[in-house]
């Protein structure tokens, strides 16, 4: 009987994996589209003509670009100027690699510029999806609005967030999340990818399973959010799920 149960469980996992893979290929289009835009258009245009187009900004010294995503009025992507696939890349655990989350947070002003009015920090979120939760194979951090319901939940559970990675009560969007508080000074000094790899057991060996997000807390500190792929709970580890690219939170703040 036990052998049958194991077989059925293995079969279920295989089916879920196939479904997840099918979803990925169905929605991915060309998974190298962003990489081609960055490496074949934005970077050469900046180098040769001092024009970042079609990117909004190319920072050659910092090793990143900012690119307006086609989804939503204010969503931007921060991407490296060289090849990095995603959260699974060993380069992200190299201390010499740029601190992309810090750069993305520093670049959030571009949302206000496009909006034509200040976008409050508590309405902004950063997110990078896991290997199974993304559709593009070039590293990209989504800079976009936070979902209003996620904002409310983070405010409600603020007391449960500490300087250690701990489960966020109730998770987010039906998925389990770990949360860790950081200050801007800490974020400037140390990459969240290193914090995750060095502080969460077994994370270093399986970084590609994780998605990371960040938002501001009500006290002005920042909260890092991490979720791990779990096919049994249909969690593809897409931290972008905490974002609202339509930016309804800006209407709620009026």
Curated annotation (Swiss-Prot):
Protein localization: Cell inner membrane
InterPro entries xref list: CDP-diacylglyc_Pase, CDP-diacylglyc_Pase_proteobac, HIT-like_sf
Reaction(s) catalysed (UniProt annotation): a CDP-1,2-diacyl-sn-glycerol + H2O = a 1,2-diacyl-sn-glycero-3-phosphate + CMP + 2 H(+)
Keywords: Cell inner membrane, Cell membrane, Hydrolase, Lipid biosynthesis, Lipid metabolism, Membrane, Phospholipid biosynthesis, Phospholipid metabolism, Transmembrane, Transmembrane helix
Keyword presence, Lipid metabolism: yes
Transmembrane segments: 6-26
NCBIfam families xrefs: cdh, PRK05471.1-5, PRK05471.1-6
Superkingdom in the source lineage: Bacteria
Gene: cdh
Pathway listed: Phospholipid metabolism; CDP-diacylglycerol degradation; phosphatidate from CDP-diacylglycerol: step 1/1
GO biological-process terms attached to the record: CDP-diacylglycerol catabolic process; phospholipid biosynthetic process
UniProt keyword Iron-sulfur present: no
UniProt organism field: Klebsiella pneumoniae (strain 342)
Family the UniProt entry places it in: Belongs to the Cdh family.
GO MF entries: CDP-diacylglycerol diphosphatase activity
SUPFAM superfamilies (alphabetical): HIT-like
Major place of residence: membrane
Protein name: CDP-diacylglycerol pyrophosphatase
Topology versus the membrane: Single-pass membrane protein
Entry GO terms, CC: plasma membrane
EC number: 3.6.1.26
Pfam families per UniProt: CDH
